């Protein structure tokens, strides 16, 4: 079994129960899914770039991503409707916990000048979104085999009703936050 899943079931649930005194065990917040999005603006000029982004995201997430398409044409960016402009993957259950474990333990310590996340990244409904500027912080990515450094957006969707509950939940998973709530 995964360490983060065991950590949630054995410790975090109890801590949340004590802190917020839930009456129903189903009201205790949990992480529902993790969405990783990689926008590839260069794909407008070179369609092969999207394949490299898909390969990188497959290595990082362990799951094949979906290619995202442009919803409407924008002449300024030379963008046409239904052009491939990125890829995303939604992780749930065991793959989600596996990714979060690799993110917190391996990837985040490798980010340059990283001091922690800001509480401003919460959306007011308990979801947490942040961006990484380089995909090479993940050990699955070989620096010599990538064509260019790309960033990604990561959204952690929780069942928490407030940002405070969500912050407490993510702090239980050792997410580094740098300012007070």
From Swiss-Prot:
Entry-linked InterPro entries: Ribosomal_uL5, Ribosomal_uL5_bac-type, Ribosomal_uL5_C, Ribosomal_uL5_CS, Ribosomal_uL5_dom_sf, Ribosomal_uL5_N
Q: Which organism is it from?
A: Rickettsia canadensis (strain McKiel)
What protein does this entry describe? Large ribosomal subunit protein uL5
Cellular component (GO) terms are:
ribonucleoprotein complex; ribosome
Q: Which residues form a coiled coil?
A: none
PROSITE patterns, per this entry?
RIBOSOMAL_L5
Subunit structure of this entry? Part of the 50S ribosomal subunit; part of the 5S rRNA/L5/L18/L25 subcomplex. Contacts the 5S rRNA and the P site tRNA. Forms a bridge to the 30S subunit in the 70S ribosome.
Family under the similarity heading: Belongs to the universal ribosomal protein uL5 family.
- Give the protein's function: This is one of the proteins that bind and probably mediate the attachment of the 5S RNA into the large ribosomal subunit, where it forms part of the central protuberance. In the 70S ribosome it contacts protein S13 of the 30S subunit (bridge B1b), connecting the 2 subunits; this bridge is implicated in subunit movement. Contacts the P site tRNA; the 5S rRNA and some of its associated proteins might help stabilize positioning of ribosome-bound tRNAs.
Q: Which terms does the UniProt entry file under GO BP?
A: translation
Q: Which GO terms describe its molecular function?
A: rRNA binding; structural constituent of ribosome; tRNA binding
- What high-level taxonomic lineage is stated for the organism? Bacteria, Pseudomonadati, Pseudomonadota, Alphaproteobacteria, Rickettsiales
Identify the keywords attached in UniProt to this record, alphabetized. Ribonucleoprotein, Ribosomal protein, RNA-binding, rRNA-binding, tRNA-binding
Query: What NCBIfam families has UniProt attached to this entry?
Result: PRK00010.1 (NF000585)
């Amino acid at each position: 079994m995964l360490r983060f899943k065991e950590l949630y079931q054995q410790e975090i649930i109890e801590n949340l129960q004590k802190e917020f005194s839930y009456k129903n065990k189903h009201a205790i917040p949990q992480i529902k899914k993790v969405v990783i999005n990689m926008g590839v603006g260069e794909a407008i000029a070179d369609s092969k770039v999207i394949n490299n982004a898909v390969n990188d995201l497959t290595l990082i997430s362990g799951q094949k991503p979906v290619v995202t398409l442009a919803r409407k044409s924008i002449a300024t960016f030379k963008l046409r409707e239904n052009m491939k402009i990125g890829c995303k993957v939604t992780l749930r259950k065991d793959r989600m916990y596996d990714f979060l474990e690799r993110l917190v333990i391996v990837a985040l310590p490798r980010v340059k000048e990283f001091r922690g996340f800001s509480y401003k990244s919460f959306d007011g409904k308990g979801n947490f979104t942040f961006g990484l500027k380089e995909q090479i912080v993940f050990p699955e990515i070989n620096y010599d085999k990538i064509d260019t450094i790309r960033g990604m957006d990561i959204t952690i969707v929780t069942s928490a009703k407030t940002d405070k509950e969500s912050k407490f939940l993510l702090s239980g998973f050792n997410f580094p936050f740098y300012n007070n709530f």
